[in-house]
Amino acid sequence: MTAMAGEVVEILSADDLRRTLTRLASQVVEKARDALDKLVLLGIHTRGVPLAKLLGQQVEQLEGASLPIGELDITFYRDDLDRIGPRTPRQTLIPVDLSGRIVVLVDDVIFSGRTIRSALNAVHDYGRPNAIWLLALIDRGHRELPIHPDFTGKALPTARDEVVKVLLQGIDQRDGVELWKPS
């Protein structure tokens, strides 16, 4: 994403992001209760993948359990490629059979719900999970579909023309969340 003119507001600092991920991992563990061995974290490309890995590390610190972590590319499932332009497909890596599992879809920002609809379609091509839970770091509203996260790091009401930017060390050389407001 290129820089845009206007105001940039810090929403989560690196420390805030770390604490939020710890809280989200705790919530997932609590909801899973005795089914921790059935959990699979699937990060949606691009930033959902490193977020899923960070959540997996947090779960391991909390519970001593190592969860399978996968990567989900939804390029061929999108219904909005004509609007957003062509995308280069990324790797889908599903480490275990999803049948009978509890899949936690991990995404950085939920907006219209279209990405998640595409992800749900993709997941079912890899098995029939017992349940699919949605974890979104930021929920900015403006839903076009009846999709709501099971776990939310931060609800952030935004204007449609604003941009929420999740920054991760491995991609952006720093951690945090920013809101970019147009001028």
From Swiss-Prot:
Gene3D superfamilies according to UniProt: 3.40.50.2020
Q: Which organism is it from?
A: Thermosynechococcus vestitus (strain NIES-2133 / IAM M-273 / BP-1)
- What family classification does the UniProt entry report for this protein? Belongs to the purine/pyrimidine phosphoribosyltransferase family. PyrR subfamily.
The record's catalysed reaction(s) read: UMP + diphosphate = 5-phospho-alpha-D-ribose 1-diphosphate + uracil
Name under which the protein is recorded? Bifunctional protein PyrR
List, alphabetically, the HAMAP family matched. PyrR
Q: Which residues bind substrate?
A: T46, R47, R87, D107, D108, V109, I110, F111, S112, G113, R114, T115, R140, V164
Gene that specifies this protein: pyrR
Q: Indicate which residues form the motif PRPP-binding.
A: 103-115
Q: What one GO molecular function would you report for this record?
A: uracil phosphoribosyltransferase activity
Functional description taken from the UniProt entry: Regulates the transcription of the pyrimidine nucleotide (pyr) operon in response to exogenous pyrimidines.
One Pfam family, please name it. Pribosyltran
Q: Which UniProt keywords apply?
A: Glycosyltransferase, Transcription, Transcription regulation, Transferase
What GO biological process, any one, is recorded here? regulation of DNA-templated transcription
First-level EC class: transferase
Q: Might you give the EC number(s) for this enzyme? A: 2.4.2.9
